[in-house]
Amino acid sequence: KKIFFLAGFPRAGNTLLTSILNQNPDIGCTPNSIVLEIYKDVFLLKTKDIFLNYPDHYSLDNVLDMIYPVYYKNWNFKYIIDRGPAGTKSNLYLLKKHFKQEIKIIFLVRPLLEVLASWITWADKTPNNFIYQCTENPTEACHYLMKDGNQIMREMNCMQNLLKPE
């Protein structure tokens, strides 16, 4: 099985692309995947007292090496596309160290003003949405969406990490 990654700006067509790709019987494309979260949680065990009492890095690294193969063991597809923030610094570090295939990330982009406009349009049509629970008008909503740590900036940072020369 070949595993690829899908990431990108929100409102850039990730869901549409996933839907199209899943029409091919050889491709299994996930919704937002938990596998990178599993990587993070297992890796962070290295900071816990129980691990530090007997720090067997080699064995825990073996577990990290096997997360992707074991997670997708029963997926009957030639190609699996794992959708998630593969471009964050910490996720890239873990993938480079423990993912035993060539890392290929499909990263969808869309002009930033279109992303913001799409969010605002969605928020206007969606009662009790998270954007208008935190803000009072479209201008505040745009500032909120662009805030460091929120989804747009996280993905912009991912793109920046992916474009850095090695």
Regions from the PLM with identified roles:
Residues K1-I67, N74:
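PAPS-dependent sulfotransferase catalytic core
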Residues P25, Y72-W75, Q160, K164:
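Secondary-structure transition/hinge residues
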Residues V70-K73, K97:
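A general structural signal for short secondary-structure junctions and capping/turn motifs
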Residues Y79-E166:
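PAPS-dependent sulfotransferase catalytic domain
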